[in-house]
Amino acid sequence: MADDYREDDVVEEEEELDEAPRPSADPKRQSYESPATAALKCAYHLMQQRIISNPRDMIGVLLYGTKQSKFYDEDENSRGDLTYPNCYLFTDLNIPSAHEVLELRSLVQDEENAKKILEPSNEPVSMANLLFCVNQIFTLKAPNFLSRRLFIVTDNDNPHGDNKSFRSAATVRAKDLYDLGVTIELFPISQIEHEFDTSKFYDDIIYKASPNDPDAPAYLKPDAKMNDAQDGISLLNGLLSSINSRSVPRRAQFSNMSLELGPNFKISVSGYILFKRQESARSCYVWLGGEKPQIAKGVTTQIADDSARTIEKWEIKKAYKFGGDQVCFTPEEQKSLKDFGEPVIRIIGFKPLSTLPFWANIKHPLFIYPTEEDYVGSTRVFSALYQKLLRDQKVALVWYIARKAASPVLGAMMAGEEKVDENGIQKIPPGMWIIPLPFADDVRQNPETALQVAPEPLIDQMRTVIQQLQLPKGVYDPQKYPNPSLQWHYRILQALALDEDVPEKPDDKTIPKYRQIDKRAGGYVLDWADELEKQYAKITADQPKSTTLAKRPAKADNPDKAAPPAKKVKAEAGSGNIQDEVQKHFEQHTLSKLTVATLRDFLASQGRATAGKKAELLERVEELLETKF
């Protein structure tokens, strides 16, 4: 099956047709899911997702290895020879409509229709012919897209065997796709008795670099273990998980920007945003007043308030108020006011990594990687700087201007190590990260709280509870817990677009599994609660009992005569009492609760200066107590 799936630019997915059901290792769990059916369901689910989340992406479905053939206006009944035999273009590469999604769903659910289209061919399919067909589709339908990708889903790791001519032709066609800017990504399906081996054929046609940016870390090695499914359900889930993890291409935030290490010493880098919060956004306005919903096109018109005359664009001037007067600026002058120079990343100094607090990362970090387009040798210099920062645990302070007319940003450039999973698959490539540093107004002061430490028995028992509730291998995988509100938003839009029933409640995978929690840690939680009661009783028993009884004042002889106000006598506290009180607040980290008079009395008793504001007094008291006690 070839699924031509296009993302912001384009993508195509292929799988050689295999209708044989996959045997299940579990005899109680029978499965009748063939790789072809699983791949079609995967394409259908992806089309459902992308039609809502990325409505401008182009997606297509191309089947290969079929007995029937279809390519645009050609079919089995056309005159002459077929251009691409055994290739069936089920859905053309285009922005998918609701009708095309329903057709693909019908193919997945309708067995009779699927048997006609998914009938395997008797002859082997030429991969060179298939790749040339894909080349024609991309050239005709998406000639100007930056990111075009071909997803190949197959369980045949050696389609041509020892036929060197067919293998050589396929290699040439794959190079043509690479030169065209198409990235080929493989999703192998391993059989129970045979593991998929990419070295037999597919390593020769899949390039490990992006065609648009050969130096960018765009290649991800296929995860064969993920697709080593033993039944149809796990096969489908594995395909969806694998494709979803690579469904979004790494788009460059900027390309070929100068990284200035010193005067007249520059290299070129490209920047990527690898982590970004995904939110539901309104892409257009829809008019519901007619028989069918239509996309509304907004038009803005400026009208004079006094005469209702339409104001032309050249009549509008922008001004700023200075001293009560309006000072007008021309568009060129406004641009010059916002011009801080050409886009650049300039290193202005270095600091230890320990000086960068964890709370300084309040915006999206920027991942940068070297490119050789502007300056030859950039990769070598970048690698040397990366290794030096990583080895010495340093960060570089940079002056960063993202684009023209953008405000400059002070950032910390730090080296990030490569991260791989348990199978050795790269998850995060090695490179540099630029973290925009916050200004003083961006950081709030934490509220002052007293540190309360629980008794050791409570801590020990809670440690057991936490160990029972840890995630597998102690690692949180965000891909297993999608944003429930965002998915619910997409699910409603999908139901409206495909004329489906609106679901009653969302599928929220972030809700705790209370039964499983009770089964694994319920007994330990009850033991912890009993220990909490014991510790509370022990703490309250050590404290003196307080009373709410108050002594009544003596009755006056003449109730009509107002009693004189009681005289307040100021109790003079000794130096020992002040020291004990200050020491107590120091241990509880609540020195700020003391009054200025108390702080000055304490400093005077210690022979220190008592002049200054409260902040200065607190600083002197802390220095004194840290050195003395």
From Swiss-Prot:
Pfam families: Ku, Ku_C, Ku_N, SAP. InterPro entries: Ku70, Ku70/Ku80_beta-barrel_dom, Ku70_bridge/pillars_dom_sf, KU70_core_dom, Ku_C, Ku_N, SAP_dom, SAP_dom_sf. Residues 259-468 form the Ku domain. Residues 1-33, 543-575 are annotated as: Disordered. Its EC number is 3.6.4.12. One of its GO terms (biological process) is telomere maintenance. Residues 19-31 have a biased composition (Basic and acidic residues). It comes from the Eukaryota. Residues 1-18 have a biased composition (Acidic residues). It is found in: Nucleus; Chromosome, Telomere. Single-stranded DNA-dependent ATP-dependent helicase. Involved in non-homologous end joining (NHEJ) DNA double strand break repair. DNA-binding is sequence-independent but has a high affinity to nicks in double-stranded DNA and to the ends of duplex DNA. Binds to naturally occurring chromosomal ends, and therefore provides chromosomal end protection. Required also for telomere recombination to repair telomeric ends in the absence of telomerase. ku70, of the ku70/ku80 heterodimer, binds to the stem loop of tlc1, the RNA component of telomerase. Involved in telomere maintenance. Heterodimer of Ku70 and Ku80. Belongs to the ku70 family. This is ATP-dependent DNA helicase II subunit 1. It comes from Emericella nidulans (strain FGSC A4 / ATCC 38163 / CBS 112.46 / NRRL 194 / M139) (Aspergillus nidulans).
